[in-house]
Amino acid sequence: MNITSASFVASYTSLHALPEAVLPEIVFAGRSNVGKSSLLNSLTGLKGLAKTSAKPGKTRQINYFLINELFYFVDLPGYGYAAVSQSEKAAWGQLLANYIERRDAISLVVVLVDSRHPFMENDVAMLEFLEFHGRPYGIVMTKSDKLNQSEKSKCQRVAKTYAAKAKFVVNYSSFSGAGKALLLSHIDHSIISQ
């Protein structure tokens, strides 16, 4: 798959405001500061498409990006960010849960896991939630450029242990683009097979 066009559509804080569910949605989920925005920019080749920040908690809404005029990339707020109020954390959690439970257009959930700190409690909870709701998902091990080959192989094995039902596990580096072609191939397959 080649991405030839990508544009920001809108940010949403309510399920009722989301676009009509007519195009497939590829959803990106993960802990705060795991690299979701960097991955989206890397996949599309557009550095400023998704706003990045070294400060966790930058994404606070559900962000929609129209890709090739055919499907959406959906950037969810990061989970596990401790520096927000309990009420804000609960609101984000409810928004994410409702979206994943109810949104018919979801083709695939791409769960980003920091390869340097793989499968923390929040990551495992997300995978269990997706499995409970029968959502197809794949795992992207981010920041893999910071690992040597032995550590990358270990991450792959750990991922398969925690997520036996994952459609794929990809080591990815937004810095070098390693894993990009493989991830785009998996995304393409999920859209075609929907």
From Swiss-Prot:
Record-listed GTP binding positions: 30-37, 57-61, 75-78, 142-145, 172-174
Listed GO CC annotations: cytosol
Necessary cofactors: Mg(2+)
Example GO BP: division septum assembly
Domain of life: Bacteria
An example Gene Ontology molecular-function term: GTP binding
Key words of the record: Cell cycle, Cell division, GTP-binding, Magnesium, Metal-binding, Nucleotide-binding, Septation
Job description of the protein: Necessary for normal cell division and for the maintenance of normal septation.
The protein's name: Probable GTP-binding protein EngB
